[in-house]
């Protein structure tokens, strides 16, 4: 009993922290919403600046408007002299510029081709200083998220004094100073290397940021596939030694959770994704059509599955909604809940696989990884996707008929939140079938399929009560398939034909992982699910850093789970001899026997 006391304390500390923090969310958000500040209206889809910010057209004149120093003629002359504008106008003969007042003391000049339908250049000029504040061409006109506005996603989480310490905290407990060139270190660095791409994105260098996102994804895909080989029974698994005792790591989880929630309440912004969840929840509650006819400030917010909007209903009911894109406390509450849920599920999966040490290590990895905080501080729904997939993996750790039905139901929920997890449905369906006789395999597949179909039908009722399947298909699948985006190599360089081949390859990988014999434990399932999601993300035209949490917890499950002992379904840690020193009290806690 003495040997397991610290472990029990760690479990209780994490559980108590999650309960306490959930209670704080429910009590603190309404009162603190006023301190959050005006949320930045960040759009993740293309939108005309003229339409989004409603500048006021100004006729050409030599007389400045009342209260302004510059006239519209002077503003146009300043813009005409810019080398970037001269270059783009040479490409579009007959182009012309229109002048607008933008806000109190800013001017906007928009250049159009001779037809007046295509905006080819945009300049923002400060009236007081006469300085050019912004100048954009190409896709950065329509895609405001490509302009590198400070804090547009996650606000201060992008600051180096937050981001870099998180990177250190993420890798430090897993670093082995005796083996600095271990493969695990390379894996963790690959996960952190998305930061390089993000740094270029934050400075509006899209032609650098987009290609730099692919090497770590390709590496992680190859790494996950390499872990699918069946482990040899005669070879002991490699061990992982944490740099700090498990109890201190559990305290780190509590501290980082508090930091994340505090930062969300006082500093984060709600992007259009979180706003869409609140709008959709309100429409369901008021018995309005879920798809089509959305507000102009989030016109395409109805591009997600119905589950996404239904899960926001409790938060919309508790925190309310003003009908505007304001601080949206409901979106804050939902994002915090999704984050806590993912943390708790990782702990539960790790505890079931090997014991509390692995559970705490996985929970710590989630709360220390900067890109999960990036998602939380943007108040998006991406941690919900991760949580639903993790719940399905947890269900897969049980060998009962009810667990099989649970996998099917959770797979349907994940697929009808965002559609990419649909690639995991075959994997989750076939997990564990190799251990069953043929009659039991058929029954298990039938139960999984029935649970999947039944859940999908049930959660679709609010949408189908007003919208046809065709309308839903048009607003979701068709819109996402047809929208162009510069946030992938396919959209940035016009490689749509190659993109189709990658999409086909991703589908083939997902199907192959479901039927080809592979490692059959939870480590194998996590690695296969991570590989399938990464393969899908490699083939989508609109990729963004918020999607990293979809596969990150699965990658960590595979990487740490394989080091924590043979087999991924061990419930209890290995027994400790009475005469041996307590494993949990060692300065460097070993996860393997």
Which residue stretches match the model-derived regions?
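Exposed beta-strand-loop-beta-strand "reactive/processing" segments of non-cytosolic proteins
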Residues: 86-128
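Primarily membrane-embedded glycan-assembly and transfer machineries that use lipid-linked glycans
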Residues: 204-249, 256-393, 397, 430-548, ...
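Membrane-interface junctions at the ends of membrane-embedded or membrane-associated helices
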Residues: 1-3, 225-237, 396-407, 429-443, ...
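Transmembrane-embedded, aromatic-rich helix segments that form part
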Residues: 407-411, 420-434, 547-549
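Extended, hydrophilic extramembrane loops/domains of integral membrane proteins
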Residues: 116-149
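Short, non-transmembrane alpha-helical segments in secretory-pathway proteins
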Residues: 62-100, 157-163
């Amino acid at each position: 009993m003495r040997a397991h006391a610290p472990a029990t304390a760690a479990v209780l500390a994490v559980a108590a922290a999650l309960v306490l923090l959930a209670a704080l969310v429910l009590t603190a958000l309404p009162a603190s919403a006023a301190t959050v500040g005006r949320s930045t209206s960040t759009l993740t889809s293309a939108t005309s600046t003229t339409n989004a910010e409603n500048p006021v057209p100004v006729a050409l004149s030599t007389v400045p408007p009342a209260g302004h120093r510059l006239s519209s003629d002077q503003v146009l002359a300043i813009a005409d002299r810019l080398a970037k504008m001269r270059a783009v106008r040479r490409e579009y003969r007959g182009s012309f510029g229109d002048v607008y007042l933008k806000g109190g003391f800013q001017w906007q000049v928009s250049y159009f081709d001779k037809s007046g339908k295509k905006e080819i250049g945009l300049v923002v000029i400060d009236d007081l200083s006469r300085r050019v504040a912004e100048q954009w061409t190409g896709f950065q006109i329509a895609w405001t998220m490509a302009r590198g506005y400070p804090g547009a996603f996650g606000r201060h989480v992008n600051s180096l004094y937050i981001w870099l310490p998180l990177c250190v905290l993420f890798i430090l407990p897993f670093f082995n100073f005796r083996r600095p060139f271990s493969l695990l270190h390379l894996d963790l660095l690959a996960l952190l290397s998305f930061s390089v791409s993000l740094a270029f994105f934050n400075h509006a260098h899209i032609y650098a940021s987009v290609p730099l996102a692919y090497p770590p994804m390709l590496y992680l895909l190859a790494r996950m596939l390499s872990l699918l080989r069946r482990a040899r029974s005669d070879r002991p698994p490699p061990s992982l030694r944490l740099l700090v005792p498990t109890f201190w790591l559990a305290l780190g989880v509590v501290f980082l959770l508090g930091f994340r929630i505090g930062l969300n309440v006082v500093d984060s912004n709600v992007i259009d994704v979180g706003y869409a969840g609140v709008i959709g929840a309100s429409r369901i509650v008021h018995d309005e059509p879920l798809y089509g006819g959305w507000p102009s400030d989030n016109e395409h917010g109805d591009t997600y599955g119905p589950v996404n909007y239904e899960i926001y209903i409790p938060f919309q009911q508790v925190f309310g909604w003003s009908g505007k894109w304001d601080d949206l406390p409901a979106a804050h509450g939902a994002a915090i809940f999704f984050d806590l849920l993912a943390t708790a599920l990782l702990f539960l999966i790790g505890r079931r696989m090997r014991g509390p040490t692995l559970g705490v290590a996985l929970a710590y990895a989630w709360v220390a990884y900067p890109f999960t905080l990036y998602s939380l501080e943007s108040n998006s729904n991406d941690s919900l996707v991760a949580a639903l997939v993790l719940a399905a993996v947890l269900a897969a750790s049980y060998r009962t008929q009810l667990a099989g039905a649970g996998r099917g139901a959770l797979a349907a929920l994940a697929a009808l939140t965002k559609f990419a997890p649909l690639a995991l449905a075959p994997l989750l369906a076939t997990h564990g079938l190799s251990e069953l006789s043929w009659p039991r395999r058929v029954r298990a597949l039938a139960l999984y399929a029935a649970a999947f179909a039944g859940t999908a039908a049930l959660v679709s009722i609010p949408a189908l009560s007003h919208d046809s399947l065709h309308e839903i298909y048009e607003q979701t699948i068709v819109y996402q398939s047809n929208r162009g985006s510069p946030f992938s190599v396919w959209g940035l360089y016009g490689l749509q034909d190659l993109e189709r081949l990658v999409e086909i390859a991703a589908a083939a990988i997902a199907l192959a992982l479901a039927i080809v014999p592979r490692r059959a434990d939870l480590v194998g399932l996590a690695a296969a699910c991570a590989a399938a999601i990464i393969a899908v993300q490699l083939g989508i035209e609109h990729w963004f850093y918020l999607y990293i949490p979809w596969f990150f917890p699965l990658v960590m499950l595979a990487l740490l789970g394989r080091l924590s002992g043979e087999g991924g379904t061990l419930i209890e840690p290995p027994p400790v001899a009475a005469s041996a020193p307590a494993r949990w009290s060692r300065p460097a806690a070993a996860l393997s026997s």
